[in-house]
Every structure is written in structure tokens, then in C-alpha cells.
């Protein structure tokens, strides 16, 4: 049913006023082969008339209420339940109209070919102002993840119909973000079963960031699941642009420790990934730390011999293969570990050293403090000499190892009950170690000046890694 009325102005330059009231049970429309629109049980009003500022240019007022509304374009589909639209559009030139108004709905479901999970929104209203859409406390659900979004989005229509850039500036709050499921939805965009089966992927796979995404997000997240880790109270900025994800100055809590993090992930194609992170973790249990960063077992295997809490700073970057494995020759890292009252647990290595140096027979030996600098470059790990005090001894420990687990460490005895200064050389690998008594090599390596130089070396390397992050986020190749 439709009612149409019009006016015939005396001024021939003035746009004719035309009004149409329409009520339909079903409405189908299409534009070309890709854009389709369907509506059920709809009431609509449309009015064409002159613009207020220029009567020679047309303006359209449009309102619609529909039990359901469906729209599809270029493989992207959007469906709304109990939809309401109130819009006004002024014509700017021959092909450009500028819409303003409100779109509301009880429920919305959105699907795109690049993402394996539907995006669902509950009852909300969004404001439209030209290409800008404004959200206010919009409730969004993606699989097991939920969030509330406030902010602006630009270019939604052109992103859906032409694949052009989609820009967003949003504040997000959430009770739960399941990164495993979201990553799966990017890794397997056409396989919903694969995405929904398990929150913990049995094997992490490379996922490519869509080229047309440019998001700046401020986050306040209660819980975030990533692999087998649970992060709580996550706050900070997340930028997604230039096919990269940049987590900037995030604060969080996990493994009973406070953390701050900067992270970058860039995947422009399925062939490989650049990834990097800069973590500062305060007073974390060593056993949990090794579980959190499993690569530490390879880089600093001696760490598992200690018990206690440490401050842990690490900056690292590397290229990953399509299965998200580190390409070892590309790994660069700068690590600092500091702890007080750490317990060295008894083991074969310590037992051999104790026998050689005549330590008192103890199952546990306490270090007053340690401060260790480690760097990784070109497949080699360097543990810079650091000072330890245990039992009646003061010693400097350092050395090198390959990521193939072959190592060459040295312990210089600087103070002991023995009448001479000596050193212990430890070489080989964890399965077959050789111990030799020799000269103390690190007599001058743990002076304040030497330690300061080492600190500077490690910090400079860490800064270089973080600077590479910034180049990647700006769309440049890391050097």
C-alpha cells in the first residue's frame, strides 16, 4: 500500500516537494549482482523536498520500521531484527548524498568472508553522520568474547561494498576476550566448525590482518585468554593498521604478577610473520615465568634450577614461519633478570661444582641477590658476567651458548676459603657436561663500571628492538 502526494511550486528553480507513505509485507531490492536488500513487514515514509540552505538542491527525509531487514554486498551480510531508521540526506553533487540520522535495532548479526565468526549486537542505536557512524555503549558479542564499544567508525558502507579502508576510534570494555577463538576465526575464515571447536588451538597458525583495517582502540578488559594463559585487568591502547597489530603500553596481571607490555604482530601474507614484544614483569615466580616464556628453557636453561621471585624485563623480535614457529637465525632479544633471596636447588650440575669447590653440604643454597643481563643475536646467547654470593664464596658467572644447547660457561671465584683465586669452566650440553679448573677470567668484569657498560649494551639492544616495532606499525619493513 502506498500514498503519494506532491506540490507544484511557482518557482521553477525550486525542487518539487514529494511525499510517499508505504506499507509492505515483503520488499526485495537489488543493485547490480552484488548488493541485495530484503525487508519484512515494513512501514516507510519518504519525503523529497528542497534543502533549507539551497532550494535548488534536493533533500530526502526517510524513516522505516521493519520486523526484519537484510542487506548483503560483496559477500558481506548484515541482518537486523526489529529495525528502525530515521535519516535525512542532502545532495552535495551529482553522485554524492550526505546522510544524517539514527539506525536502531533489537538484534544485529554481521558476517564477512574474512572472519569465521558472526558479529552479534544486542539492542542499540547508532548515529550516522555522512561516512561516520557513532556508537554509544554498543553491546557486541563474537563467539565467546563480549565487549561494549563507544566511539566512531568511518567508511563502513564503502568497506562492505568496495573493500575500502574501515577506520575506527573506539573505547572497549569487556568481561572476556578469547584470543584463541578470534585468531582461529582469522586463520579459518570459512570454517565455522574449526573456529568453534576449541578455545585453545592445538597448533597456532598464522593469521593475516585484513589490509583495509585501521583501528585505534582503548581497552579496559577484565579477562583475556591467550593460548593457555589468563590475563586479568588489561588496560591500554591497541592499534590495528598496515596489516599489523600493535599493543602499546598495556598493563595487566597474570601468574600472580604485574606486567607491562608492548607487542607487535605483522602478517601481510600467509608466507611469514614479523612479531616482537617488550615485557616488564614484576616479582614473578620463576617456575611460572618459564611456563609463560617457554623459550627461556632454551635461552637460559639454568633458570629452572632457581626458586623464588624475580623482576624480568625482555625485549625480543623475530620472524615466524606459517606455523608460527620462530625462525631461529632472526631471533634478537635483550633480557634482564633480577632477584633477591633466590634458592638454588640441588642438582647434578651444582653437586659437581660443590664437590670441586668444597661447598658446605646443603640441599638448598640461598643467593642474596642476582642481576643478570642476557642477549640473543645470530643464533648465539650471551650471558654477561654477573656477581653471586653463596655459602662462603663470591663468584662471577657468565658465558655463551648456541640455541642448539651447546654452551661454554665460566665461573670466576673472587672470594673463598681457598688460598687462591680460580675458575671453573663448564662446557658441552645438558646431557654431557665437562668441568675443568682454570684461571679466573672475570676478575674485572663485575666492577660497577663494567656492569654499567653491560647494562647500557642490553638496554641499547632493547631500544633498537622497540624502534623496529614503530617502523613496522608505520608500514615500513624492520631493519
Where are each of the predicted segments found?
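Short catalytic-loop micro-motif centered on adjacent basic/acidic residues
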Residues: 135, 247, 383
